[in-house]
């Protein structure tokens, strides 16, 4: 079936075509089977993936799989039902969107040590501003360099630190031992402390559906923080005759009242002039506004 979907100014085509993907061999549900055995393969290109109205990640290219968290299949209508395990990818996020992630998710609790975070790119550094909530909302400013840890997380190393009326030679001086310990023990989701560095875990920092995988490289590019998972240049990409798309293959996938067996589905943006705007929370609105066609292979 080919479905043309439209929401606001976006237009999307949904195609299920058996010629595009070699379906994975059927893996029936069985007691004790691992979630990975029910994973749906996914490949994306030039997708603006929205987590919230003000948080989006530009997926330039990605290959991975939807791994069910519980049960035997990923469910589009339940973003907590699966994780997106990334094999290889290149994705970008603006500093403004990253600041929104920190404010709305990582440091969202009332007793969070940091509030009102803003982030800007200044040449080869991130300039991070915010308020120390436990110190009377004192303003601070930090310039950080970016690198990747051996286990695939993002390291923010403080090169310069300023805080009004507070001596700060490093991370411990700025946040204090109590707050540093709070972060170090993982009680602040998605961020840990290591000496005078902050370690950001994209898998925990971003809201559902969570992304798992190891970041291999990170760089600042224009007004974007670019993360590279694996080695996209060496990956054997499936040829999809579209520029902006999300392609799913193998096993079971449920969306709405429909469950696709031997999933073979491609969501296509027919307008290649800008990225494919996709918002999982509102995908049904796009489906309702569009129309569908059934393929000879009974694809959906």
Residue ranges and their predicted role:
Residues 1-11:
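Bacterial N-terminal signal peptides that target proteins for export
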Residues 12-20:
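Bacterial N-terminal signal peptides
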Residues 22-26:
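Sec/Tat signal peptide C-region and signal peptidase I cleavage site
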Residues 27-300:
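Extracellular/lumenal and peripheral-membrane lipid-interaction modules
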């Amino acid at each position: 079936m080919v479905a043309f979907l439209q929401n606001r100014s976006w237009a999307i085509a949904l195609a299920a075509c058996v010629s595009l993907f070699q379906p994975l061999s059927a893996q029936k549900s069985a007691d004790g089977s691992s979630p990975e055995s029910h994973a749906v393969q996914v490949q994306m290109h030039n997708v603006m993936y929205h987590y919230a109205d003000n948080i989006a990640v530009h997926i330039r290219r990605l290959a991975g799989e939807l791994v069910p968290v519980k049960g035997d299949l990923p469910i589009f209508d339940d973003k907590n039902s699966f994780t997106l395990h990334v094999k290889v990818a290149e994705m970008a996020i603006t500093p403004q969107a990253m600041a929104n992630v920190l404010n709305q998710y990582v440091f969202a609790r009332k007793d969070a040590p940091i509030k009102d975070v803003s982030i800007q790119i200044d040449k080869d550094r991130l300039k991070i501003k915010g308020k120390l909530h436990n110190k009377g909302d004192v303003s601070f400013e930090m310039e950080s360099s970016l690198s990747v840890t051996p286990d695939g997380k993002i390291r923010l190393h403080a090169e310069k630190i300023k805080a009004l009326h507070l001596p700060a030679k490093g991370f411990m001086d700025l946040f204090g031992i109590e707050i540093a310990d709070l972060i170090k023990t993982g009680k602040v989701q998605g961020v840990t402390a290591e000496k005078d560095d902050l370690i950001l875990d994209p898998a925990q920092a971003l809201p559902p559906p969570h992304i798992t995988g190891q970041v291999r490289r990170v760089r600042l590019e224009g007004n974007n923080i670019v993360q590279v998972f694996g080695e996209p240049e060496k990956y054997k990409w499936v040829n999809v005759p579209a520029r902006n798309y999300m392609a799913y293959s193998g096993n079971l996938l449920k969306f709405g009242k429909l469950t696709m067996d031997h999933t073979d589905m491609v969501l296509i943006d027919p307008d290649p002039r800008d990225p494919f705007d996709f918002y999982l929370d509102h995908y049904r609105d796009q489906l309702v506004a569009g129309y569908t066609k059934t393929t000879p292979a009974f694809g959906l």
